[in-house]
């Protein structure tokens, strides 16, 4: 499972999108990066494979994106990769 975390301006909690396939996760990540690099606000729709839910947002409100891999094994308690883990440290 691949996880995309999208950070919105003024919102401390990320929007999380799960993708089962690495290729689909890379495509979604690249579409967010391309939209951010364009410099002009665009609309973007992403689908979460885990729940089948969709999110639609304006890229002008995004300030970052991160892609991580979720392994099947248990992680260390109380730790998590990503933006929020860096802020808590």
Swiss-Prot record:
InterPro entries: UPF0367 (IPR020885)
Annotated stretches, region: Disordered: 69-89
Record family assignment: Belongs to the UPF0367 family.
HAMAP family in the record: UPF0367
Protein name as catalogued: UPF0367 protein CYA_1023
Species, as recorded: Synechococcus sp. (strain JA-3-3Ab) (Cyanobacteria bacterium Yellowstone A-Prime)
Taxonomic lineage: Bacteria, Bacillati, Cyanobacteriota, Cyanophyceae, Synechococcales
